[in-house]
Amino acid sequence: TTIRRYVETDTGHRVPNHKSKCRHLHGHRYRFEAEIEGDVVTVSGVSDEGMLMDFSDISRVLMEHVHDVIDHAFVVYEGDEEARRACELMGDEHRTVVVPFIPTAENLAKWAFEAVAPHISSTYGNKLRLVAMHCRETPKSIATWRPKLT
């Protein structure tokens, strides 16, 4: 069984070497959707009985480790000197998040997966795991990151 829960952020970025308008500073209403797999809790009388995990617990993790980090912030690649200088001109009050990758939807999906995965825990032994993170950049554009199973 799988369940999904999402958070949305208003976040700026740019793709510095892009052939089109994405190379300019701009923003999106991102949706980060966690997909969790596991067994339904069968322990009688517990709060999560009949669930994989309480949706509010997933929301708390997504809010803390994704939303609160990049909402109303500008995500900039550490190698994008122009964008970093532009952000620095706005001073310390500007929310800038410097990352070691170009902030495409694909890379942000992986970043969010890695931020959230350690915090998905199985309280009742139902072996929960984050199987995918979906990053919707626009209503028509969604990237998904899944770890390779070995």
Predicted regions, residues:
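Charge-rich, low-complexity N-terminal segments
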Residues: 1-150
